[in-house]
Curated annotation (Swiss-Prot):
<comment type="function">
    <text>Transcriptional regulator.</text>
</comment>
<dbReference type="InterPro" id="IPR010985">
    <property type="entry name" value="Ribbon_hlx_hlx"/>
</dbReference>
<dbReference type="InterPro" id="IPR013321">
    <property type="entry name" value="Arc_rbn_hlx_hlx"/>
</dbReference>
<dbReference type="InterPro" id="IPR045865">
    <property type="entry name" value="ACT-like_dom_sf"/>
</dbReference>
<dbReference type="InterPro" id="IPR014864">
    <property type="entry name" value="TF_NikR_Ni-bd_C"/>
</dbReference>
<feature type="binding site">
    <location>
        <position position="89"/>
    </location>
    <ligand>
        <name>Ni(2+)</name>
    </ligand>
</feature>
<dbReference type="Pfam" id="PF08753">
    <property type="entry name" value="NikR_C"/>
</dbReference>
<keyword id="KW-0804">Transcription</keyword>
<dbReference type="InterPro" id="IPR002145">
    <property type="entry name" value="CopG"/>
</dbReference>
<keyword id="KW-0533">Nickel</keyword>
<keyword id="KW-0479">Metal-binding</keyword>
<dbReference type="InterPro" id="IPR050192">
    <property type="entry name" value="CopG/NikR_regulator"/>
</dbReference>
<comment type="similarity">
    <text>Belongs to the transcriptional regulatory CopG/NikR family.</text>
</comment>
<keyword id="KW-0238">DNA-binding</keyword>
<dbReference type="InterPro" id="IPR022988">
    <property type="entry name" value="Ni_resp_reg_NikR"/>
</dbReference>
<dbReference type="GO" id="GO:0003700">
    <property type="term" value="F:DNA-binding transcription factor activity"/>
</dbReference>
<dbReference type="GO" id="GO:0016151">
    <property type="term" value="F:nickel cation binding"/>
</dbReference>
Length: 137
């Protein structure tokens, strides 16, 4: 017996047309998979607001010539060693580096780490990509 449950959804025709364009743009094969992904996305956001264990990646680009920048990055990473699982350093060109920090733990702590790294003088861009730890179906 399947665990799949079918249910009906009533939508305004204009909203349905917009949703169908969204499905086409994202290459979904059907509405059901798009709805499942949207539900998962909202449940994931909820995990991040309820202090459940989460995972994610912090990415940032910085000018490695910036005075004392690397020491500040290392100090911050050591301050948050309990949530950092891995880091990857990539040389983009002569001046710019990309760093990817894989994280797992408390969402508040991870957000503080992300904000601290992005606030360092010389960091040109940074973002936090959120995910869960596999609890959402």
């Amino acid at each position: 017996m399947s665990d799949i449950v079918r249910f009906g959804v009533s939508l305004d025709n204009t909203l349905l047309k917009q949703f169908d364009r969204f499905i086409k743009d994202r290459n979904y094969t059907n509405r059901s998979e798009a709805i499942r992904d949207l539900i998962r996305q909202e449940l994931l956001k909820k995990e991040w607001t309820e202090d459940q264990e989460v995972a994610g990646a912090i990415t940032y680009i910085y000018d490695h010539h910036q005075r004392d920048l690397l020491n500040k990055i290392i100090d911050i990473q050591h301050d948050f060693h309990d949530v950092i699982k891995s880091t990857q350093h990539i040389h983009l060109d002569h001046d710019n580096c990309l760093e990817i920090v894989a994280v797992k733990g408390n969402p508040t702590t991870i957000s503080k780490l992300s904000n601290a790294l992005k606030a360092i003088k010389g960091v040109r861009h940074g973002s936090l990509s959120i995910s869960g730890v596999g609890q959402i179906a």
